[in-house]
């Protein structure tokens, strides 16, 4: 999978300066989004922003919100804390949502000096617009997905 992704990145670099850009990696649960983003960040140089860090806090979990596709994502916070800062090329930080405490936790520093891989379900949600230079959707067959989820928990 990493070789295929590297070919995608190489093709992308032909139209964008080498070593920069925002790649959003969406896809099905357990398809390998986090693993691929982290491997590419190490291989090509870059940072990873995890959509899991933007879970919706309990106070905002209304029935209406939970019925929306992607309603479990605190997209307002992602829209203000991440998207406007991606194009700058400057380091920035945001606070990770800590599911064990159900509140904001540690501050995450994004170096933003190369590729930024935004990975996770709903990273390509329409509410975010076209903040990314490229979108990648990772799919997985049902059996492998089930096996990975069982092994994860």
Task: Place the predicted regions along the sequence by residue.
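Extreme N-terminal, non-catalytic leader segments
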Residues: 1-23
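Active-site signature of alpha/beta-hydrolase-fold catalytic machinery across serine-
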Residues: 39
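Short beta-strand-centered segment that lines the nucleotide-binding/catalytic pocket of NTP-utilizing
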Residues: 44-59
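Conserved nucleotide-sensing/catalytic segment adjacent to the nucleotide-binding pocket
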Residues: 47, 60-103, 115
